[in-house]
Amino acid sequence: EKIHDARSNNVHSVRIDQTYRGIVLKPEQGDLYMLMWVDKHDEAYDWARRHDCAIHPVTGAIQVIDISYIKPASEPVVVDKPKLFAAYTAEQILALGVPPVFIEQVMALVDTVGLNQLESVMPAEAWEPLHWLAEGLDYQEVLEEFNEHRNEPVDTNDFIEAIERSKRRFHVVENEQELLQMLNAPLEKWRVFLHPSQRKLVESPANGPVRVLGGAGTGKTVVAMHRARWLSQRLADKPGKKVLFTTFTRNLAADIRANLQRLCSREEMARIEVVNIDAWMSEQLKRHGYDFRVVYDSDEGRRKCWNYALQQVPAELGLPENFYSEEWQRIVQPNAVYSREEYLKVSRIGRGTALSRIQRAKIWPVFEEFRAQMARAKLREMGDAMHEAIILFKEKQVQLPYSSIVVDEAQDIGAPAFTLIRSLVPESPNDLFIVGDGHQRIYRNKVVLGQCGINVRGRRSKKLKINYRTTEETRQFAVGLLTGVKVDNLDGETDSSNDYLSLLHGEKPMITYASDFKEEAATIIKQIQALLANDVRSQDICITARTKHAYERYASALNDAGIETYNLGQDSGDSDQRPGVRMATMHRIKGLEFQYVFLAGINDGVVPEAKAISSDDPVEQRDALFNERALLHVAATRAVKGLFVSSYGVPSTLLTVH
């Protein structure tokens, strides 16, 4: 039935059952029904009286506004403070999508406090551009981001056309089957849901490599997965061609593969190969007759080779042994330095100890001997193996099936890997799609993409600015852990963590301190029992600690209290169906999310881990400390609804500073 005293014309109520009513807008033009609200009878009618639904005259988007929050015009009050948006005209503010009824209020704002008070009452797509203007972003950049239809004529009565411009807030259900699919979709489907505001980024053809930055929770991995699917769809008429989707760890590759299988059809998935880059390269080298075993630092054979090499250390320089391992990892390997002459010339920017050419000449025999020992043992480190893979593929004219490569967690992938990735596909449209965030770099790999032959400057660089996972309160806590730290943008420039925000709000993270482990564990158990009593599933809760040994202690305490746990090991996946509070290291939960996260044992000497920041080189120590801070930042941003942080004994300096 029609609601005659509704704020908007042509508003009707639909009876759902004896209690609930739906509020539906039926515009005069077109065969369109817009479900606006569902509530109990009286509340639904009250909502219809308070809310106006109109088409914005400039952006053409449909906006729903609660008119009870609009302040009536009043006599101007003389205020000494300058206006927040004094640099812009009312027409410019209107062009950003601000509803006409809010223009006067917005132009009168004097600070961000007043602006933040409008967040809950203005349409999100109207408030966000104002937030970015207040943060200092260029007006034209904000306009292009939020008003892509600015040059198109707008008919404020044509709701069917307006729907096409409003996909961020509205979805057109074409038939009953689609509606049922949406209503019955499992949680896993929503986890790979692409926000409509990101669809343009996913589906826009590119003339070359694209880099996408964004803070934790902004949907980078979801964007990457949808990009892979879009690229796969374009290969339907190109038999044998594939999309390579690569990430840094085996765990993340397994999680992404599982999510892509939920997102893609069987045919689309058959054209996407999801891999951990190290494992992929090792397999390819074996297939093409590579005669060396690829090893990591922990390998015993590699350790013996290194100890032999240290016998070449020039005692007169007085440098500690860890200087040589850091020099190898930070300078020699990433820059593919293979000769004394190359080492004398290579840039050492970022190292704390300056070296003359004479000192470099004395140091080089250590690295030369190490490579000789590794060659005798038929061993190769990953960096050398990647460099040799490029040469081998070229010499053997290896034809790989990939037309495009999608790279996730790019901040943890080093220069050797990116140089290899660049060599795997020819420079062409849609060749590379790279997503990452320097604020989440938890491994000691740093890259400047331009030095790897990957040009992402200018319009080839995009940034996601809305956090869809965590609350603003959790985001602020996590960002605060990195206060005062300069973070790179994967291409040698600085990236900010202040230009993204969360639209969700909740409780501030709960931080507790205990005198000993027993007291801390008891507090955690009590908090988890309260969550379980409120119908939170055990598998939606995760306790994470710095090390495996640490989280196993908490698991034991929970088990003793009758709470089931499930360990997320290095090579184990996470089945959402299996009950049990998830237990994991902070490294393991990278890329995952949980409704509630407990950061446990955040003690002095544990986070940051003492041995991780023990370098004698002040620059190395600074970088290692950043990795530890980033690790805590990453762990905190896994929480969707609530974050709990606890310590016992002396708390971590990261908590006290925070």
Which residues does each predicted region cover?
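A short, surface-exposed loop/turn module that caps and links secondary-structure elements
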Residues: E1-R15, S575
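Enriched for short, Lys/Arg-rich terminal
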Residues: H12-L133, E145
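A short, compositionally biased micro-patch
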Residues: R15-T19, P27, N467, L592, ...
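Accessory/regulatory regions of helicases
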Residues: V64-L94, V98-Q105, V110-D111, E125, ...
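ATP-hydrolysis module of ASCE/P-loop NTPase motor domains
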Residues: P76-L133, G289-Q359
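Interdomain "pre-motor" coupling segment immediately N-terminal to P-loop NTPase/helicase cores
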Residues: L115-E174
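Accessory N-terminal region flanking or inserted into the helicase ATPase core
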Residues: N157-P196, E203, L213, L319-S403
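Conserved helicase motor core of SF1/SF2 NTP-dependent helicases
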Residues: R191, H195-K242, F248-R293, S356-Q359, ...
